[in-house]
């Protein structure tokens, strides 16, 4: 069965719920020999791992977490500025694939905060061992095995097992597995490296070297792809929605002027206090949910009564119930009749009435299910939201759709906070390619990046635009709003 009912999803995931993780989760066993926190079906083992791993994700024991994220964000900006800035006045045009750039950013972030060492994707501006392409090929197989669970038995066959990724591989998922293994071994060697990071927290709480080799691989895959997907979708919709961009820039400008935004990168605590920024992030998570895997729960042996379309029905024991993330996040009863539209304003209370507060709360409780719920909630939620808070704010305030530049210049309302660059999608007709394979994978999200205009350049451009209109015989006032 599949449900788009958030109440049922929460009920199945509640701490004392008799529902358990179904065999779908077993397909998430990325290491060929060992399970991980996402693939364990045994509830006791899963609960024990969550207890021991949660402090490492909280940030309280990872003193470098926010600094490391800031460092990688600035690294990404440096790369964009040095390699991808176009100069139309010199007929120099370069394209940047935002889907790859955001993946490089999140992969380097998770490796840095987990191990204290990055893969170097941003350094190389490349995927040197073909990890992303290999993962795109590997994910559909995981989803098929999760649905047709009997197929997982063939993974035990020597011929198939030998073809699976190994830590000795030079490319793809196996190379990531090898990187994780090397970093773990450094913490257990004769001269172990000690650093206040996630890995150290896990070791302190008794995870073995073998367990860590499996868990760190899961950290990398699950912790980077979903966040990158959420980030690029938010940036895409913000950059292609001028009213949204204007309002976000206005909020950030006001906060900066009031000294409520740190430089060079906004603090996570500051970003959480900006209502429209938070609305943009939530709307991005809603409009294109980053995770689409079923996450199927198993009905207890005695069966359970569940509500379907307002009618209570009996589900036999052993039934698998997965979630429909798209249906849940596009439910008009929860998000309004315009739920197919990217409109962050839906998250802002229209008044202080209890009814309005309840409406926003219901939406918020639903969209947070993108991170799971209850005893199955994502441990990395805090890390992911910190990345989104910072990256959407910093890139969003540095972004302006050049498709609409002329209209903005005519109105003479260029925002003064475009500190870094403008972004223009290369194609509005087909802005990117997309595959829904457990995660929502985007490719070819190509943008043109240009330097921002100074105040003097803006004034000159406005004057030049007016002269061009006169030369073209434009009607007076034809561009007035």
Where are these regions (language model features)?
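Cytochrome P450 heme-binding "Cys pocket" and the immediately downstream C-terminal segment
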Residues: 82, 242-244, 354, 363-364, ...
């Amino acid at each position: 069965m599949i449900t788009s009912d958030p109440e049922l999803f929460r009920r199945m995931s509640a701490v004392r719920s008799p529902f358990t993780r179904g065999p779908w989760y077993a397909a998430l066993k990325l290491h060929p020999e060992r399970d991980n926190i996402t693939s364990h079906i045994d509830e006791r083992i899963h609960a024990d791992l969550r207890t021991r791993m949660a402090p490492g994700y909280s940030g309280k024991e990872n003193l470098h977490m926010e600094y490391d994220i800031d460092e990688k964000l600035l690294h990404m900006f440096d790369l964009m500025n040095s390699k991808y800035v176009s100069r139309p006045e010199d007929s120099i045009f370069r394209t940047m694939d935002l889907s790859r750039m955001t993946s490089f950013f999140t992969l380097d972030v998770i490796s840095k905060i987990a191990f204290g060492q990055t893969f170097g994707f941003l350094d190389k501006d490349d995927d040197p061992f073909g990890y992303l392409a290999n993962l795109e090929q590997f994910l559909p197989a995981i989803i098929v095995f999760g649905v047709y669970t009997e197929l997982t038995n063939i993974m035990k066959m020597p011929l198939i097992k030998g073809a699976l990724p190994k830590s000795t591989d030079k490319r793809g998922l196996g190379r990531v597995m090898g990187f994780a293994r090397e970093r773990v071994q450094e913490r257990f060697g004769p001269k172990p490296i000690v650093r206040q990071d996630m890995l150290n927290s896990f070791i302190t709480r008794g995870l073995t070297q073998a367990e860590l080799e499996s868990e760190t691989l899961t950290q990398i895959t699950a912790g980077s792809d979903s966040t990158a997907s959420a980030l690029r979708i938010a940036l895409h919709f913000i950059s292609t929605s001028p009213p949204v961009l204007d309002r976000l820039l206005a909020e950030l400008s006001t906060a900066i002027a009031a000294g409520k935004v740190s430089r060079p990168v906004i603090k996570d605590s500051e970003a959480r206090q900006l209502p429209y920024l938070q609305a943009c992030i939530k709307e991005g998570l809603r409009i294109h949910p980053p995770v689409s895997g079923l996450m199927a729960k198993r009905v207890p042996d005695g069966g359970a009564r569940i509500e379907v379309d307002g009618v209570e029905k009996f589900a036999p024991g052993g039934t698998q119930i997965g979630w429909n993330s798209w249906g849940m996040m596009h439910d008009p009863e929860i998000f309004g009749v315009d739920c197919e539209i990217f409109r962050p304003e839906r998250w802002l209370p229209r008044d202080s009435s209890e009814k309005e507060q309840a409406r926003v709360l219901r939406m918020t409780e639903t969209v947070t299910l993108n991170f799971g719920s209850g005893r199955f909630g994502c441990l990395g939620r805090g890390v992911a939201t910190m990345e989104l808070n910072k990256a959407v704010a910093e890139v969003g305030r540095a972004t302006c759709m050049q498709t609409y530049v002329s209209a903005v210049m005519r109105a003479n309302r260029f925002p003064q906070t475009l500190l870094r660059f403008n972004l223009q999608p290369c194609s509005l007709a087909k802005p990117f390619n997309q595959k829904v394979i457990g995660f929502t994978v985007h490719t070819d999200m190509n943008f043109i990046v240009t330097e921002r205009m100074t105040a003097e350049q803006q004034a000159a451009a406005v004057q030049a635009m007016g002269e061009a209109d006169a030369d073209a015989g434009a009607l007076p006032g034809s561009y007035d709003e």
